[in-house]
Amino acid sequence: MPVNEEDLKTYRRDLHKIPELALAEFKTHRYLLEKIQSWQTNFMTIRQVEELPTAMLVKFSGTDPSRTVGYRADIDALPVTEDTGLPFESTHKGVMHACGHDVHMSLALGLVQYFSEHQPKDNLIVFFQPAEESKSGGKLAVDLGIFEGEWHPDEFYGIHDQPNLPAGTLSTLAGTLFAGTAELEIDIHGQGGHAAYPHLGKDPIVISAELIMLLQTVVSRDVDPIEGGVVSLGMISGGFTNNVIPDTVHLAGTVRSMTKDGLDKMTTRIRQIVEGVALANDVKINVRLETGSYLPVENNPDLANNLLSFMEQRQDIAFEEAKPAMTGEDFGYILQHIPGVMLWLGVNDNHSLHSAKLNIDEAALLPGFNALKDFIEWRMSQGE
């Protein structure tokens, strides 16, 4: 039986009901495993990973393989309380598939279902990856050696849903699609006291204001305007009443760049600014910058151009060339080790990714699946 829209909608809705946070996707894993086991064939191997227990890989041995093609779908959700009113909304309080990973999984299940009935020409590995949102599951998988030996894809593909695109429209580019990110935390240790006697202490609130303004010069004065970048502080915490200077202020934010070199330059400059402000104010400032897991998603130019060629040939597939986005995705870490391409899939919603009201248009599922399946078969028909 061919994979149809109702199949994909069922998978998506079932998974939407049971969202789970990074590395705790046990119900999700069980659901995926039960579905996949129901399609078991003699040319399919299901692999579970002891060190990463919610991960799963499904390998189809090809009829005449000259390569191994990989497809990755992330499976975790976000700590968001859903506010959609859908009949299949989250049954897990405070957790929601607000980034569309239910969509990603439904497409991957569709691939497994289809290729269990149509043995591919080349080897195919479908990777269900935990912990994209916060625990760097892509890095964990690579560092554990999951993709070594017979489980090594020669090329990797992935899809991410995009509310700003029409339902079913695919989009990518030959180059960097998503930014690399670094998470920033700063703790300013001043000396608190009575607000009427600021000269007797060291006011971390005033120092934080100075630091916040200086950090905004990193992009405007240290980054090539053609390359771009982002330094955004989304959290400031300090003090507990109006007439007491606190001892500490905590800042947190994100740093983003379209290149690894750009990200390295920005984080170095941030550290220099923090050190300078600490010295100028005679206080201690601790800075933490987490980098290395959410690298830029750099599409391999040859593979991306090959995919673009396929899209040009298929007038029945809605496609538009993408612009680079400041979105972060740990698929970038995988692509540092295995060449590949990530695409957007339009899901047509007025609410953004990570919104409690995100409600994707399920009309995107079948065209997204068909385009993905057809591309994989076309790619395999090309030979080496």
Swiss-Prot record:
BP term (GO), one: diaminopimelate biosynthetic process
Active site: D74, E133 (proton acceptor)
Protein name as annotated: N-acetyldiaminopimelate deacetylase
UniProt source species: Leuconostoc mesenteroides subsp. mesenteroides (strain ATCC 8293 / DSM 20343 / BCRC 11652 / CCM 1803 / JCM 6124 / NCDO 523 / NBRC 100496 / NCIMB 8023 / NCTC 12954 / NRRL B-1118 / 37Y)
Pathway: Amino-acid biosynthesis; L-lysine biosynthesis via DAP pathway; LL-2,6-diaminopimelate from (S)-tetrahydrodipicolinate (acetylase route): step 3/3
Catalytic reactions of this protein: N-acetyl-(2S,6S)-2,6-diaminopimelate + H2O = (2S,6S)-2,6-diaminopimelate + acetate
Major enzyme class: hydrolase
Biological role: Catalyzes the conversion of N-acetyl-diaminopimelate to diaminopimelate and acetate.
UniProt cross-references to InterPro entries, sorted A to Z: AcetylDAP_deacetylase (IPR023905), Amidohydrolase (IPR017439), Bact_exopeptidase_dim_dom (IPR036264), Peptidase_M20 (IPR002933), Peptidase_M20_dimer (IPR011650)
Keywords: Amino-acid biosynthesis, Diaminopimelate biosynthesis, Hydrolase, Lysine biosynthesis
Family recorded in the similarity comment: Belongs to the peptidase M20A family. N-acetyldiaminopimelate deacetylase subfamily.
Assigned EC number: 3.5.1.47
Pfam families per UniProt: M20_dimer, Peptidase_M20
GO MF annotations in UniProt: N-acetyldiaminopimelate deacetylase activity
CDD domains to which the protein is assigned, alphabetical: M20_Acy1_YkuR-like
